[in-house]
Amino acid sequence: MESWLFLALVLVVALVGKNMSLIIATGVVMALKLIPFASKWLPVIQAKGINWGVTVISVAILIPVATGQIGFKDLINTFKSPAGWIAILAGIAVAILSRYGVDQLAAVPQVTVALVLGTIIGVVVFKGVAAGPVIASGMTYLVITLFNLHF
């Protein structure tokens, strides 16, 4: 019963904050809880969901390459600007930090509660986005803005 109340609270917060991603995610989880045999799938989704999400985001990021909007010229130009190097370094830093984050979640599962709360607050109150790889872009944006750099 407690899980239903928690999910209902998250749904209400998502509705108040008008965050469609969180509304859909909460609705999907609640629907899965209603399906009797789906409880076997919840641990699988919990264990693999982040990787699936990263894969979907990676596909979206690669679409401009597939459509020809981004090519080798753009890749080469990346190495010619400070902003490009910052983006590369931010991507590396996030990948390294994420490895340690995954290790910490496995070692200290209680961190998950704080992460869920922080993510909900960040998404709903501050109109943030709950996505890992996008953090690298956000860090890049911050540094580029602070130093008034351009690609």
Curated annotation (Swiss-Prot):
The chain crosses the membrane at residues 4-24, 25-45, 52-72, 78-98, 115-135. The keyword Protease does not apply. GO terms for cellular component: plasma membrane. Pfam families: DUF441. This is UPF0756 membrane protein lhv_0995. The keyword Lipid metabolism does not apply. It is found in: Cell membrane. Its main location: membrane. Keywords: Cell membrane, Membrane, Transmembrane, Transmembrane helix. PANTHER family: UPF0756 MEMBRANE PROTEIN YEAL. Belongs to the UPF0756 family. It is a multi-pass membrane protein.
